């Protein structure tokens, strides 16, 4: 009788002896809690809805919060899975090495940060030099009130790291708590410029998206080496013509093939990537073909 067979028998007898033993979730059944960057709420709500329609015994409960808190949850065992805008960094991987855990992460899509202004604001077309000047406070052409969702959000980190290159945000920069509140504030203040995740304004079939885009103007940007001013739309995100581009990742630490693994696999599958495509992000795990239209 080999060791593998003995181990299997031990598991069976243990389960029979203790009928109240906690049942582990599987790739398609059970309940898990995940932490998700709040800029992705519309997208991930839709992904979960589709996944649970395919697997009715699966129950994924998301908590939407700032990205900093998502990684904190992953490190302190409050969440097995997080959905965020960056991969694990070297410090985080070193931590998992020390505790003998092998995390799994994957780029799912290319996403974008969108800038929105009041509908009465004439400055809805900007060069990247102007954006940098607004975000670090060096642009003195006019008064701007910058509004983010949260001081610990991924959009704040993105602007500080990728646009300001470590320079601080100007004094008076505001945090409005949520992306919808950013949009609401901008709609009521003519000098405001809001920084949000593009998935809040990218689904043209969603009534909430339509309401948001009717309230504010989405800023068109010109990349440093570009010639056209473009919005944060799927084609321009994919080609890199839209300059405020970032990734969408899952990070998973699951010691067995449980529901986190099942949901992660789904997100990278055809069905999961189709939802990403419908939200006008650029899928990283499937091909997107753009065809020229002949208008007559």
Locate predicted features:
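Sec-dependent bacterial lipoprotein signal peptides
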Residues: 1-14
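Short beta-strand and adjacent tight-turn residues that come in two discontinuous sequence segments
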Residues: 65, 83-86, 91, 177, ...
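Pocket-flanking alpha-helical
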Residues: 68-99, 204
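Short, conserved beta-strand segments within well-ordered enzyme catalytic domains
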Residues: 35, 61, 80-83
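Basic (Lys/Arg-enriched) interaction patch that binds polyanionic ligands
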Residues: 114
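Periplasmic N-terminal soluble interaction domains immediately after the signal peptide in Gram-negative
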Residues: 100-104
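Central regulatory/effector-binding core of bacterial HTH transcription factors
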Residues: 57-71
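Exported/periplasmic ABC-transporter solute-binding proteins
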Residues: 16-55, 75, 106-109, 117-296
